[in-house]
UniProtKB/Swiss-Prot annotation:
Entry annotated with the keyword Transcription: yes
Molecular function via GO: identical protein binding; RNA binding
Function description: Required for transcription attenuation control in the Trp operon. This trans-acting factor seems to recognize a 10 bases nucleotide sequence in the Trp leader transcript causing transcription termination. Binds the leader RNA only in presence of L-tryptophan.
A Gene Ontology BP annotation from the UniProt entry: regulation of DNA-templated transcription
Protein name: Transcription attenuation protein MtrB
HAMAP family: Trp_attenuator
Keywords, comma-separated and alphabetical: RNA-binding, Transcription, Transcription regulation
Gene symbol of the encoding locus: mtrB
InterPro entries: MtrB (IPR000824), Trp_RNA-bd_attenuator-like_dom (IPR016031), Trp_RNA-bd_attenuator_dom (IPR023558)
Amino acid sequence: MYTNSDFVVIKALEDGVNVIGLTRGADTRFHHSEKLDKGEVLIAQFTEHTSAIKVRGKAYIQTRHGVIESEGKK
C-alpha cells in the first residue's frame, strides 16, 4: 500500500470534464480516464502508479494545498 497518498476532489462545472491519470516512471503514460458531467464529483488519489492528474474542462479542484478552478473549453 502506498502510504503517502494525497486525495484530490474534482467537481465538474460543465458537462464533459475529462480527468486523466498519468503514470510514474521513465515513460509517462495515460492509465485511467473518467468523463464527468456537470455536478458530478470524483475523489482521486495519488498512488504508487499515479503521479499526476490532468483535468480538461471547467471544474473545481480541491487539494490539501487549496482550491483552484480550471478553465472551460473554448
